[in-house]
């Protein structure tokens, strides 16, 4: 069922680029992200003794919770980082990839015309996620803290929720009609099928559970085993083309 796919990954079928900037600093660190909660998360990790790589991974996880209109575990991303110790520049490619069953004409009808919305909404629009693998790779190869320490702030943020802002309302409105088509998604990101009021709290318990699983068992638990099979089954049952070998 589609709700398995959506509620575990919390992959929302819309994407926008973030334009807001939230910065904070103390005498030692400066952090700027697209959301104030993610900025605080980065500072928290640095104050715990983590390095910039740890902070980048934790911020990514936090944005997956508090910025669902632009980030998420079901998507992809990349990181350009600098290691001062040896003056090394590091680029991490965690972009999503197309399922192996993808075809160049899969978004066209028999007459060669584009099928409206097929490449944007629903399981056929979903690439194979790279964010989780990217976070795990950064922490393992460049970080100083453990994965569970990196993900703990995002886990708590998903459990307790974040406050609806005018920005949230504006960006959700762009895809409100699409969200309504998926009951589990609308139950989380809308209130009674309407855009939430400013000050409402968005809680994502299933996302918290997914992050907890990753924190405990690593990224392999996301891409292999029962969880991965659930994702693939859900996508296929709703017309998508994922296979377990894609993950």
Region locations from a protein language model:
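Noncatalytic scaffold domains of N-terminal-nucleophile
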Residues: 24-40, 44, 52-217, 222-224, ...
């Amino acid at each position: 069922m589609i709700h398995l796919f959506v509620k575990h990954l919390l992959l929302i079928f819309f994407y926008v680029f973030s334009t807001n900037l939230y910065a904070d600093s103390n005498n030692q660190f400066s952090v700027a992200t697209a959301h104030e909660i993610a900025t605080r998360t980065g500072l928290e990790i640095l104050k715990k003794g983590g390095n910039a790589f740890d902070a980048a991974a934790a911020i990514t996880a936090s944005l997956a919770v508090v910025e669902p209109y632009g980030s998420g575990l079901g998507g992809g991303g990349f990181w350009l980082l600098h290691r001062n110790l040896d003056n090394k520049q590091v680029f991490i490619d965690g972009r999503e990839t197309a399922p192996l069953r993808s075809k160049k004409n899969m978004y066209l009808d028999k007459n060669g015309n584009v099928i409206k919305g097929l490449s944007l909404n629903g399981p056929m629009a979903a690439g194979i996620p790279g964010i989780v693998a990217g976070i795990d790779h950064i922490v393992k190869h460049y970080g100083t803290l453990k994965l569970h320490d990196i993900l703990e702030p995002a886990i708590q943020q998903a459990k307790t929720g974040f406050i609806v802002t005018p920005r949230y309302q504006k960006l959700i409105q762009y895809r409100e009609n699409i969200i309504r088509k998926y009951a589990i998604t609308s139950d989380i990101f809308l209130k009674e099928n309407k855009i939430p009021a400013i000050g409402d709290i968005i809680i994502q318990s299933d996302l918290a559970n997914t992050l907890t699983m990753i924190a405990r068992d690593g990224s392999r638990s996301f891409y292999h085993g029962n969880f991965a099979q659930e994702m693939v089954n859900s996508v296929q049952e709703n017309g998508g083309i994922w296979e377990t070998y894609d993950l």
